[in-house]
Structure formats: structure tokens, C-alpha cells
Curated annotation (Swiss-Prot):
Family: Belongs to the AAA ATPase family.
A single GO BP: modification-dependent protein catabolic process
UniProt pathway: Protein degradation; proteasomal Pup-dependent pathway
Positions contributing to ATP binding: G290, C291, G292, K293, T294, L295
UniProt function note: ATPase which is responsible for recognizing, binding, unfolding and translocation of pupylated proteins into the bacterial 20S proteasome core particle. May be essential for opening the gate of the 20S proteasome via an interaction with its C-terminus, thereby allowing substrate entry and access to the site of proteolysis. Thus, the C-termini of the proteasomal ATPase may function like a 'key in a lock' to induce gate opening and therefore regulate proteolysis.
UniProt keyword list: ATP-binding, Chaperone, Coiled coil, Nucleotide-binding, Proteasome
Comment, domains: Consists of three main regions, an N-terminal coiled-coil domain that binds to protein Pup and functions as a docking station, an interdomain involved in ARC hexamerization, and a C-terminal ATPase domain of the AAA type.
Region of interest (Disordered), residue spans: 1-40
PANTHER family cross-referenced by the UniProt entry: AAA-FAMILY ATPASE, PROTEASOME-ASSOCIATED ATPASE
InterPro entries: AAA+_ATPase, AAA_ATPase_domain, ATPase_AAA_core, ATPase_AAA_CS, NA-bd_OB-fold, P-loop_NTPase, Prot_ATP_ID_OB_2nd, Prot_ATP_ID_OB_N
Protein name (record): Proteasome-associated ATPase
Lineage: superkingdom: Bacteria
Length: 602
């Protein structure tokens, strides 16, 4: 029974009903029969009065209950606000936490004879805090096994470790020079300053190599993490692209020569050992630009991977292709270029240690390894060349690593690099002749391209016959010796003259550009004239436009150097005259001045 109404001095509904019934009974009992109608009327009136009082009491009770609920809600809200304010006051009065770095973890020990007390036996950690080294206790809520050296911890006002945090994410960048055991290392910082540092717990589980960049907290002397540097990432080994010898056109003899030199040692190592032969350490690919030197280098790496996987019976064996562009290695600081070269071969040896073949490809080799003593403004080659020589045939062996160099000025490379035993195989990548050009065209003009209906109808709807005819007519136009294809007239030092045609400066890159240009013409015809498909006329027009773009390219100031880069070797050239049929064909040629020596630079 709810007694809340008794607190207000009011009867409950049950009590009111009982009182009304008792009153009616007494009054009815007091009436002596015979009953009269007037007495009954009085009794009914009194009952109604009592009922009205009961309803009034019920309304008062409902109002009191509602007021009581509101009061309870207000009290609960006030209690929550009081608790919030109390917590805020406690937090404002709480002293700040401090940070420390773990130097050493001291688990609980059994007291030994002569020990100095609990400081040497209880669980504790040695930390750096505000430049001081201290031994502090650990809260029972903190698991000591989850802490590691170099890690940051949170300390309360009593300098008790109450929480373990992560590692500092900022610091000084240093270079690893030497490992000193498992937990220490010798590093080189700014101004070549060397110092011994400790390795953090997270860093002790990482495989570190000489030359790695580390983040150092100089306040505590801890190396915290390994940092990938941009200059190092540029030298990261790349997996070989999916390029095979079948993707290269017009270089059959050169590819066969390279396969004999590179693949035979992998296919028949027993025969090589029996005959006392060693695999070549390097290959030099030289020739004019755009003739496929880089493609061949990638195909060599792909082929080596396939042969190595076949020999090892492991189809998952990968090969790696490290593409190094000569100018990327040059650095204005003394010794940095040599360090980059050491890093390249260190990474190559690391990857090759598991049997994976690694190809180190130096593009534009003449820009980096020039003949010593030929520098005009510097002598950096006097230290760069010996560094490469020591890496190729030094004390450390290069197993499963082959060096491939590419250059269009092989006459500028230091002779010590070109001697047998270093770059053993030298392959000249010549400009394609008509047959080789047709082979290259066939790589780009394939039967899955859309061809014009008239061209297909001319050859009976045979797609392959249409492709063959397109290739044949385009090659004939490119290699024609008609007057319209005359390009240059060169005069040699002995007075002889020679007429050079566009075919003398053709390359695989030019062939690809001609096909791409023809495809763009086909797309433009489709958009403007609604005529879909590649036509022979597109290819012939592309040949003419491609040649005209090169009419101003010959360097008439230093024609001999320009001719050497373009692949024209032999007698020194003293005079060049452009013979292009067009706007530049009427311009007179220019002779060079021979009074000053400009060196090897153009």
C-alpha cells in the first residue's frame, strides 16, 4: 500500500470507501422497519456525497503523485550536476603527469647478501626524465613485461609509472655505420659526427643494414625507428617488368649474342665449371638513341629469372631490375656519389643472396663513368670510376648479379671499365635496316586494330594481308633513296662528301612514333569524317610529318659530336648542310669553328 498520502494527512481511497460503507450500514441499521421512502432517499444522498468526496480525494492523490515524480527527477538532475562539478574540481586540482623514457627494466629479484635494500630487489624501471636518470617504481596496474627500452611512460606526481605509451615519432636523422652487438650501434650524424647509440626495443627486432637511416632521440641516446629516405627509395630494387625477347623487334643477332653470353652460364653451369669458365660480370650496350638498349636490358633480367626458376624448380623465384640513370647518382657533396654506388651493390648482393638474379642497369653510362682526366670543370670521375671497378671485381664477389651499361658515347667511357673481366660482352645496337624496321612495325601494327573498309577490300578482306601490305609500303617509303628523302650532306675532314637519308637516322623509337601518329590521324578522321579505321595513307603521312619534325635537329655547330651520338662514326665531320625538302631546305649549311677546343660537351 502506498503510504505517501498519509504523509500529507489525507486518507487512502480504500480507507475512504470503508468509512463510507460503515457509515451507511450504521445509518441503515439504525432505521427501524418499516422503511420509508424518505429515509432511503436521505441514505442515497449521503452515499453520493461520500462518492464525490472519494473522487475528490483521488484527484488530489493523482496530483500529489505527479508532483512527487517531478521532485524525484529534479533531485536526480541536481545530484548528477553536483557529481560533475565535484569531478571537475578534483580534475582541476590534480597535479600534471610527466613523461619519461625507459632506459632499463628491472624485474623483481631475490635479495642477495649485502644488498642495499628494496631499491635493488623490487620491480622498477630506470628512466630519463627532465634530463635526469632515475629509478622509479611501477604501478601494480601496469604489466612490466609490456614495457620496452626506449618507450615513453607516464609518471604521476609521485614519479610512479602509471601507463606505458608509444615511441617518440620525431628525432634527428642519422646513418647506421656499424652494429655493436644486438642493442647498440655506431651511427654518423651531422658533420660526420660519430656516436654510439642504443637501439629501442622495437628496433632490436628489425633487420638493419649498414647505410640505413635511423631516427635518433638525442636526449636519451636511443635510436627509435628505421626511416625510409627518398634518396634510398630511389634505389630500391624493382621487380622486372614483363618484357621478353619476343617483344623486341629487329634485333635478332644482338639478342642471340646476349643470350649466348648471359643465359648459357645459367643453363649449363656444370659445363662452364668443367671448362674453367665464369659467367660474364657485365654487358655494354652501345649505339644511337632509341634503338632498344633499355628494352634489351629488361628482357635480359626477365630471361634470367625464368632460367633461374627453371633450374631451381621454383616458379615463384623473382628477378630484380635496378635501373640507375647516371645523372641521378651525381651529388654536389664529396663522397656522396661513391656512397650511392656502394649502396646500389649492397642492395643487389642482398637480393641475390637467395638465388634471385639481379640486373644493375646503368643508363647513360658515359655521363657518370667518363675517362679519368677529361673533366672540364671537375674531376669527380677520378673517384667514381675506381669505386665502380672495386664493386665489380673487388674483394666481395658478385654472385647472381650482372651489370649492364648503356651509352651512345662509348668512346667517352673509361677504358678500365670496358676491359674484359668487367664489362665482358660489348654489343652494338645498330639502327634498323629495312628488314628490321618491318619487324618492328609488325610489333605495333597488329591484326586486332580497326582498319578502314577500303583497305581491307583491296586485299580481299584478309586482315593479315592488309597488315603486311601496310608494313611493306611504309618501310619502302621510309627507306627510299629518292630526292625527297635526302636529309643531310656531310663533309669530312679529308674533303669527301656524303649524302645521308632519313633511313640513316631511323630507330625503333621513330617507328613507334610513326605508328602512334598514324593512329591519331585515324581517330581524327573518325571524329571529323565519320570514317573509321587505320589506312595506309595515315602511315605514309605520318612518315613525312615525322621526318619534317627532325629537319632542324642536326647540330651544325658541333657536327662531329652530334654525328657520334647519332651513331655515325669514322672520319671527322667538319660541315653539315641540311637538304630537307621544305621550309628548311633552302637554308645554307653552317661550318664549325675549329679554333677553340670545346671539350666533349655539345
Amino acid at each position: 500500500m502506498d503510504t505517501s498520502n498519509n504523509d500529507l494527512g489525507r486518507p487512502t481511497p480504500e480507507e475512504a470507501n470503508d468509512a463510507a460503507e460503515n457509515t451507511a450500514s450504521r445509518r441503515l441499521g439504525a432505521v427501524q422497519p418499516p422503511e420509508t421512502s424518505s429515509e432511503l432517499t436521505v441514505a442515497e444522498r449521503q452515499i453520493n456525497i461520500l462518492r464525490d468526496k472519494l473522487r475528490h480525494i483521488d484527484r488530489q492523490l493523482a496530483a500529489a503523485t505527479q508532483n512527487n515524480s517531478k521532485l524525484v527527477s529534479m533531485l536526480e538532475t541536481a545530484k548528477a550536476e553536483i557529481l560533475r562539478l565535484k569531478g571537475a574540481l578534483e580534475q582541476e586540482g590534480q597535479p600534471p603527469y610527466s613523461f619519461g623514457t625507459v632506459v632499463q627494466i628491472n624485474p623483481r629479484k631475490q635479495p642477495a647478501a649485502g644488498s642495499s635494500g628494496q631499491a635493488a630487489t623490487e620491480e622498477s624501471v630506470d628512466i630519463f626524465n627532465a634530463g635526469r636518470k632515475m629509478r622509479v617504481g611501477v604501478s601494480p596496474l601496469v604489466n612490466l613485461n609490456q614495457l620496452a627500452v626506449g618507450q615513453e611512460v607516464l609518471l604521476n606526481e609521485a614519479l610512479l609509472v602509471v601507463a606505458g605509451l608509444g615511441y617518440e615519432r620525431a628525432g634527428e636523422l642519422v646513418t647506421l655505420k656499424e652494429m655493436l652487438g644486438r642493442d647498440r650501434a655506431l651511427v654518423v650524424g651531422r658533420a660526420d659526427e660519430e656516436r654510439v647509440v642504443r637501439l629501442s626495443g622495437a628496433l632490436q627486432s628489425v633487420h638493419l643494414k649498414v647505410g640505413d637511416a635511423l631516427s635518433l632521440d638525442s636526449r636519451t641516446g636511443y635510436a627509435l625507428e628505421k626511416v625510409p629516405r627518398a634518396e634510398v627509395e630511389n634505389l630500391v630494387l624493382e621487380e622486372v617488368p614483363d618484357i621478353t625477347y619476343q617483344d623486341i623487334g629487329g634485333l635478332g643477332p644482338q639478342i642471340e649474342q646476349i643470350r649466348d653470353a648471359v643465359e648459357l652460364p645459367f643453363l649449363h653451369p656444370d659445363l662452364y665449371r668443367e671448362h674453367g669458365l665464369k659467367a660474364p660480370k657485365g654487358i655494354l650496350l652501345y649505339g644511337p638513341p632509341g634503338c632498344g638498349k633499355t628494352l634489351i636490358a629488361k628482357a635480359v633480367a626477365n630471361s634470367l629469372a625464368a632460367r633461374a626458376a627453371e633450374r631451381a624448380g621454383n616458379t615463384d623465384l623473382k628477378s630484380y631490375f635496378l635501373n640507375i640513370k647516371g645523372p641521378e647518382l651525381l651529388d654536389k657533396y664529396v663522397g656522396e656519389t661513391e656512397r650511392h654506388i656502394r649502396l646500389i651493390f649492397s642492395r643487389a648482393r642482398e637480393k641475390a643472396s637467395d638465388g634471385s638474379p639481379v640486373v644493375v642497369f646503368f643508363d647513360e653510362m658515359d655521363s657518370l663513368f667518363r675517362t679519368r682526366g677529361t673533366g672540364v670543370s671537375s674531376d669527380v670521375e677520378t673517384t667514381i670510376v675506381p669505386q665502380l671497378l672495386s664493386e665489380i671485381d673487388g674483394v666481395e664477389r658478385l654472385d647472381n648479379v650482372i651489370v649492364i651499361g648503356a651509352s651512345n658515347r662509348e668512346d667517352m667511357i673509361d677504358p678500365a671499365i670496358l676491359r674484359p673481366g668487367r664489362l665482358d660482352v660489348k654489343v652494338k645496337i645498330q639502327r634498323p635496316d629495312a628488314e628490321a624496321a618491318a619487324d618492328i612495325f609488325a610489333k605495333y601494327i597488329t591484326t586486332d586494330l580497326p582498319f578502314h573498309a577500303q583497305d581491307l577490300a583491296e586485299y580481299g578482306g584478309d586482315v593479315q594481308a592488309t597488315v603486311d601490305a601496310m608494313v611493306q609500303r611504309t618501310v619502302e617509303a621510309m627507306y627510299s633513296t629518292e630526292k625527297s628523302n635526302e636529309y643531310l650532306e656531310v663533309t669530312y675532314a679529308n674533303g669527301d662528301t656524303e649524302m645521308l637519308y632519313f633511313k640513316d637516322f631511323n630507330s625503333g623509337a621513330v617507328v613507334q612514333n610513326v605508328v602512334d601518329r598514324a593512329k591519331k590521324y585515324a581517330i581524327k578522321d573518325l571524329l571529323t569524317n565519320q570514317q573509321k579505321g587505320l589506312r595506309i595513307d595515315h602511315l605514309l603521312r605520318a612518315v613525312v610529318d615525322e621526318f619534317r619534325e627532325h629537319e632542324d635537329m642536326p647540330n651544325t655547330t658541333n657536327p662531329d659530336d652530334w654525328a657520334r651520338i647519332s651513331g655515325k662514326k669514322g672520319e671527322r665531320i667538319t660541315y653539315i648542310r641540311t637538304i630537307v625538302q621544305g621550309k628548311a631546305g633552302q637554308e645554307p649549311g653552317k661550318s664549325i669553328e675549329t679554333t677553340a677546343n670545346t671539350g666533349q660537351y655539345l
